[in-house]
Design a protein with these regions (language model features):
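Zinc-dependent deaminase catalytic domain
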Residues: 7, 15-189
Length: 189
């Protein structure tokens, strides 16, 4: 419905508002998370699967075109019961000879898929043993949140090997402090 008045075109107000509403509905959200935040979030969610009472670490491996290839978390090897092995950090028998780190689990969980050129997201900077698996598998970038053990021999060796092998590592900085997952169905809100 258009009205002509002295050679000008006037559109009734209700039609203008309807058009404006349609335009606003067709605009994308501005508060979405980045790819890096998304994949680090997946790694953090994977960490929630760890049975380790002290340290929960998750990892996520992503292809060059941002497709998740694999995830992993720190835990006992497949077939080894979480209830039959130690979780202690100090003492006569500790978890250290048994636990598979998140990064290694993510590489192994890829089940032979090509990881060349991929990115790995992990909460804690990889140790020297995980760095070897990362390098050998062809991962080319590592994003991490914490470098808690930066001065340890294992971390220093890890950084040295990754630099020599051309694996880029970057501490992920984000304004996000947390992401909340809501499992309540819409009809129950």
């Amino acid at each position: 419905m258009t009205f002509f008045f002295w050679g000008l075109v006037y559109v009734p107000l209700f039609m203008y508002n309807e058009k404006k509403c349609r335009e606003e509905q067709n605009m994308k959200r501005e508060d979405y998370i980045s790819w890096d935040e998304y994949f680090m979030g997946i790694a953090m969610l994977a960490a929630r699967r760890s049975k380790d009472p002290n340290t929960q670490v998750g990892a996520c491996i992503v292809s060059q075109d941002n497709i998740i290839i694999s995830t992993g978390y720190n835990g006992m090897p497949k077939g080894c019961s979480d209830d039959e092995y130690p979780w202690e950090r100090i003492g006569e028998e500790t978890k250290y000879p048994y636990v598979v780190h998140a990064e290694l689990n993510a590489v192994l969980n890829a089940n032979g898929r090509d990881l060349r050129g991929s990115k790995l997201y992990v909460a804690l900077f990889p140790c020297n043993e995980c760095a070897k698996a990362i390098i050998q598998s062809g991962v080319k970038e590592v994003y991490y949140l914490s470098d808690k053990y930066a001065d340890s021999m294992a971390t220093l060796a890890s950084k040295r090997m990754m630099m020599s092998a051309g694996v880029k590592f970057t501490q992920l900085r984000t304004s996000l402090q947390s992401i909340t997952l809501d499992f309540v169905p819409e009809e129950e809100k």
